[in-house]
């Protein structure tokens, strides 16, 4: 994706997206206009220092030369090459360089209007590029294959493990998710799948039901006395669940191996014993083949995870039929969404509710989120962009603050005829902070963390011509959500669900306690 802006503070508005692209490995081309060199540091209006302004958050930054009226062929070729190099750098110029943003800063002198320039050479064959619509400079890269010695050592470690497990964090590759579910099946080992892993919602779920584990955020809170794993295979980014992170921290005796295509470090707890830089899907496929040649028997270890998973969802399903709360909103949305739909899940509480309350299901739902830096900037706009690259419908579930920060994203939907379903869980402020110890300290909590705003969003929807529904009960929400999905081909709908953060937290804690007590007896 390429984004363009004028000079000055407009360039700073791109920074949150650039940071997210940096940490999430998303290719992005940043094209900023700038004042000419003689006006920099001169007090000229709308002029700031834009040269390498994004620091290490971009893969490459170039202050492009001023345009010339009659450029030499060398200059033309350098610009054509620059475009190709920028595209390649954003997409990972080699397979060990993470994808991310590239910044090209273009200074211009007046006149800026599209007027004829004497002796302009835009019709020169040098501008035309290569024949057959090929890039001027084609840059290719291949996958990193693991060495034979690394795979032999991995096979040996895996073969001698008695209690192996797979962790798949946020991941955009459906191929990797499929390879790991196959490995978990033939290896009879639990696959703890993050809600953004692409492994929870798959058409293969029923045949993998006993291995794909999604209820861990609840039942691992009662697993302190469980036997620890002796091998943990870690794929993708760090998981969303704090309970799973705590479990990894407590697994002192486990040999932990992380896998990465580009060497990006995803271990804030500094626990991994080994990092293998290679194509993770190829490694998973090789391990599955190795296992199928020497099948593992089912074990008490894997059976306990499977039994805990089943019991957890029995308890959660029953709890969803009780008093309405915010976790039920996310669970019901996922259960109603059709096969092939896409979900963009907002940060803060929504992604955690998806993790804890939306059970795995036998349908392909691609889950997106901004988990690189986990900010709430540009939530509506990002979902709008994602919707243009996936099959309809796309559902956005966000909190009220995330929606409030990007309400003008609704204008993008209106202007470009983009139709999505937006669910806003409105707990009147930063409800996630209710989970933290600071919630016990008032007035600092209420004034500085909760930041109650007292707003509802029906008038916002009306201003932008978006259909609106308010849901105060589970029946109302399910009905409104089904109507919105059926109408997504013609217009967008905003569904607002008011909730009470204190009551929501009490419901969550009660459900977790029920799960903990139930799995203790397994």
Predicted regions and their residues:
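Glycine/aspartate-rich loop-and-adjacent alpha/beta segment that forms the canonical ThDP
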Residues: 52, 98-101, 105-144, 482-522
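Thiamine diphosphate
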Residues: 31, 38-52, 353, 358-522
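A short, well-structured juxtamembrane/interface segment
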Residues: 143-158, 177, 321-336
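Glycine-rich phosphate/diphosphate-binding loops that line cofactor/substrate pockets in enzymes
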Residues: 1, 87-98, 150-164, 183, ...
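Active-site diphosphate/adenylate-binding microenvironment
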Residues: 304-391
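A short, small-residue-rich loop immediately preceding and capping a beta-strand
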Residues: 1-35, 227-236, 391-405, 420-425
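Glycine-rich, acidic loop regions that bind phosphate or pyrophosphate groups
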Residues: 32-86, 194-306, 437, 496
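Glycine-rich, anion-gripping cofactor-binding loops and their flanking helix/strand elements
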Residues: 152, 167-257, 265, 362-392, ...
